[in-house]
Amino acid sequence: MKITALLVLKCDPETREPVILANVSDLSQFGKFSFYRSNFEEFIVFIARTVARRTPPGQRQSVKHEEYKVHAYNINGLCAVGFMDDHYPVRSAFSLLNQVLDVYQKDYGDTWRFENSSQPWPYLKEASDKFRDPAEADKLLKIQRELDETKIILHKTIDGVLARGEKLDSLVEKSSELSLASKMFYKQAKKTNSCCTLL
């Protein structure tokens, strides 16, 4: 999954064009001296301004363009725009944009309202690198991934025990810890389940 660009823009309804306050892009897919690199940078700026201008304050929106999704989040005229590949989860993208706006407002306060040009902001590059993995941006996605990994480990462990030549049926029969009623319940449940799978 790839984050191609992150931008922070001032979207003042009184001005025609949104002003780019900070931006970072990863155009490594194009060669260092490639003709397409400068064209793609212009494309990013054009699309970012267009999407930011059309994202009302307090709103979020996503626009799909070819293999990219452009996500925008506008908070009272301060708008974050992200260019991600199509596989980057939407929820993670908006979580990242929200965090970018929070940190920008903490760093600059309301001074952004008076800015009319792009300023270097190192955090944007840090965020682009750190959140390349969507689980870093979305804590629920991270928890889900950890649960999935735990489930895989549990399945491997159970399969490993059973793969040593022991079957669950023989373990139940040999068990002295299970009561006769529990053993009968296991056998009846197994018969019921096998009956249902044949249908």
UniProtKB/Swiss-Prot annotation:
The modification Cysteine methyl ester is found at residue 196. GO terms for cellular component: plasma membrane; SNARE complex. A lipid is attached at residue 196 (S-geranylgeranyl cysteine). GO terms for biological process: protein transport; vesicle fusion. The keyword Lipoprotein applies. The keyword Cell membrane applies. Residues 139-199 form the v-SNARE coiled-coil homology domain. Gene3D superfamilies: 1.20.5.110, Longin domain. Its main location: membrane. A lipid is attached at residue 195 (S-palmitoyl cysteine). It comes from the Eukaryota. Residues 197-199 form a propeptide. PANTHER family: SYNAPTOBREVIN HOMOLOG YKT6. Interacts with SYP41. Core constituent of the SNARE complex required for membrane fusion at the trans-Golgi network. Belongs to the synaptobrevin family. Involved in the secretory pathway. Essential for membrane fusion mediated by either SYP41 or SYP61; triggers the fusion of phospholipid vesicles containing SYP41 or SYP61 and VTI12. This is VAMP-like protein YKT62.
